């Protein structure tokens, strides 16, 4: 009984070991390094390195986001209906990681194409990037709630991968341009925006991505789902559930708005510093803001034990406006 009190663990719940928690969290480093390089610098690469028309890039990004809105729930259904001896998440995490790593590198390498061929190539690669990222990302975050069924423990566990994700975002956003420039210098390129630096940086991140996910896959247990009965939910049924749940719709609306604002800020910030401030390297200072996000993640588990989630959310929304 004394041991149960000291650990605050309940026998009816399952818990992941400390090793599993951190090995799972490490997996977020590579995936979010990829996500942040694309989110922060892909548009700059398209317009200032490949010299694609900004209007075309904007339309491409919009079409890709619309397709993602369809693609994401489909992948969720696929994961939910997967039954293998490796579980339902691990197999897709491996497949998605390998596919996305290859497409990610190809996204930052044009093979010296030009004209219509380049526009077609970029369009195909970017759509494929979004699809392969979804194949990896959906099972990764879906795996998280299965590490423990204790609601309070889930709050603590969820902080770990998000902290590592923020660390990856901080590293790429703050040092990305410097690394690309340095890689171009090593390759003998004189232009900061030369494609070589982007390609080499993408290869480095892809390797980190594969290693990080490998640490997750080989160190985090997932129970076999062979023979496990679970009621199947079709995509049509899922959409009906969403439409009938007004609270869920409100939450989805908040997430969409938040992600829209975040993506706009990340994509256009480097242009602001380059065109308005006259120095794109000031974007690195902007990247230091992620430290505040990391501090918030560290504080959240303790804060959530003192005040309700509703108040935590309200305060978090108010802080950026203060």
Which ranges hold each PLM region?
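Membrane-embedded alpha-helical bundles of multi-pass transporters/translocases
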Residues: 2-322
């Amino acid at each position: 009984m004394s041991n149960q009190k000291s650990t605050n663990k309940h026998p009816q719940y399952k818990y992941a070991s400390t090793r599993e928690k951190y090995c799972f969290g490490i997996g977020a480093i590579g995936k979010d390094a990829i996500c942040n390089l694309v989110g922060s610098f892909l548009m700059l690469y398209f317009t200032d390195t490949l010299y694609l028309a900004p209007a075309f890039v904007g339309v491409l990004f919009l079409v890709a986001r619309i397709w993602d809105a369809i693609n994401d729930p489909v992948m969720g259904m696929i994961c939910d209906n997967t039954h293998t001896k490796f579980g339902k998440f691990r197999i897709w995490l491996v497949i998605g990681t390998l596919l996305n790593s290859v497409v990610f590198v190809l996204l930052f390498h044009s093979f010296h194409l030009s004209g219509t061929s380049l526009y077609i190539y970029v369009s195909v690669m970017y759509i494929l990037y979004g699809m392969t990222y979804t194949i990896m990302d959906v099972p990764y975050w879906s795996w998280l709630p299965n590490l423990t069924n204790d609601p309070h423990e889930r709050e603590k566990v969820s902080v770990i991968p998000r902290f590592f994700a923020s660390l990856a975002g901080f590293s790429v956003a703050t040092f990305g341009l410097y690394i690309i420039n340095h890689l171009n210098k090593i390759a003998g390129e004189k232009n900061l925006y030369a494609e070589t630096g982007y390609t080499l940086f993408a290869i480095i991140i892809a390797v980190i991505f594969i290693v990080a996910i490998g640490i997750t896959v080989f160190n985090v247990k997932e129970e076999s789902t062979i023979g496990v009965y679970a009621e199947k939910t079709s995509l049509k049924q899922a959409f009906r559930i969403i439409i009938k749940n007004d609270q869920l719709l409100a939450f989805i609306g908040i997430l969409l708005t938040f992600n829209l604002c975040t993506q706009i800020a990340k994509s256009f910030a480097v242009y602001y510093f380059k065109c308005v401030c006259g120095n794109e390297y000031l974007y690195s200072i902007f990247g230091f803001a992620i430290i505040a996000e990391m501090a918030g993640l560290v504080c959240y588990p303790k804060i959530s034990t003192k005040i309700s989630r509703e108040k935590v959310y309200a305060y978090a929304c108010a802080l950026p406006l203060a």
